[in-house]
Every structure is written in structure tokens, then in C-alpha cells.
Design a protein with these regions (language model features):
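Conserved P-loop NTPase "ATPase switch" module shared by AAA+ and STAND
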Residues: 105-131
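Conserved catalytic network of the ASCE P-loop NTPase/AAA+ motor domain
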Residues: 23-24, 108-113, 138-145
Length: 186
């Protein structure tokens, strides 16, 4: 059972899940993964709605790659308009040259804001080899101020699994999203 108790437009978040979600600050990348119905998006929207110290940007990838890229550029525009224009000019990366251009931009882009959190919902809908290369490079980037949360139904990339198993990225699975006996009794 998911962490969705009907609290109007909010989700019930147990203390243990709050603690897990709060650990995102220790990582550049966080992955929240569970099958449909576990309340991943609703929990994240509730938890990060008024999270202090971060500019939280929500990008829904439940669309075409081009619409995702447009939304990504609009989110980046809030943080750094000149970089957003460069991303938009390049377009959704569909060639090796585009991938390298995006990697270079991400490696030098810093947030003018103190800290930025980009949450990409339904990331597995648009994840391909090019985006995998881009985000693998961005992981080791020296750009400061950016953290990413990827919401997925399942993780199929061995690179992501390796990051989580080596504790180099945060992984929150259906185990953390499911209600415990204490949550149900509460």
C-alpha cells in the first residue's frame, strides 16, 4: 500500500519516509522508484512543496522528448536564463554533438540561486542512451547548487543501480514508500 492517505491534496508521510527524503541533501542524485500507485509523485510534491533553502523545480516527463525538453529549458530559465537559451537552441539531444554540448553546458552551469532541486517525474518515460550519458556526466560535474531527484517506476540502468549500491546516490524504493504496521495503526 502506498503512502497516500486522503488528506485533500497532500500525502501522509511517515517519519521514516521523511527521514529518507531529507537525506537527498547528502547526494547530487536521488532516485525514487516504485510501481504505479505507491504515491511517489504525491509524496514528493507534499514533502518538497515548501522545502526551505532550495528553489524546487518540477518537470514532468510524462510526454514526448520535445515537450520534456521545453519544460526542462523553462525550469532552467528560472535559474539561469542564458543557459536556458543555450539548452533550447541545442534542442533535445539526439546526436553525439548535442550530447557533448549539453554535457559542457551542465558542467559549467551554476545556480544563481543558493541551491536548486530539479525533480524529474516519470523520468523512465523519456530516458534513453543520450540522456543517460548526459546525466552520468552531470553526476561528476563541478557545477554547484544543483541536485536532482528522478522519479521512476523501476530502475533498469546498471549505472544507477551501482550508484545507489555504492551509496553515491540516494535510492528510495517501494519498501520505504509502503505503509508500515505503525503507519496503518496511526
Amino acid at each position: 500500500m502506498a503512502h497516500i492517505r486522503n488528506l485533500s491534496s497532500r500525502a501522509y508521510i511517515s517519519n521514516s519516509l521523511k527521514e529518507s527524503l531529507g537525506r537527498f541533501e547528502m547526494y547530487r542524485y536521488s532516485f525514487i522508484y516504485a510501481p504505479t500507485g505507491y504515491g511517489k509523485s504525491k509524496v514528493c510534491k507534499t514533502f518538497f512543496k515548501n522545502y526551505s533553502g532550495y528553489t524546487v523545480l518540477w518537470i514532468d516527463a510524462n510526454s514526448s522528448p520535445d515537450i520534456f525538453w521545453e519544460n526542462f529549458c523553462n525550469a532552467i530559465k528560472i535559474l539561469n536564463p542564458s543557459f536556458a537559451a543555450s539548452f533550447k537552441k541545442t534542442g533535445f539531444p539526439d546526436s553525439e554533438e548535442d550530447v557533448n554540448t549539453i554535457i559542457n553546458l551542465l558542467s559549467i552551469m551554476n545556480s544563481d540561486k543558493s541551491s536548486a532541486l530539479l525533480i524529474i517525474d516519470n523520468f523512465d518515460n523519456i530516458m534513453d542512451d543520450n540522456l543517460s550519458k548526459i546525466f552520468a556526466s552531470a553526476y561528476s560535474s563541478t557545477a554547484v547548487g544543483f541536485k536532482y531527484i528522478f522519479i521512476l517506476r523501476k530502475i533498469t540502468s546498471q549505472n544507477i543501480i551501482n550508484l545507489i549500491s555504492k551509496d553515491e546516490a540516494l535510492g528510495i524504493s517501494k519498501k520505504e514508500l509502503a505503509f508500515s504496521l505503525e503507519d496503518i495503526e496511526d
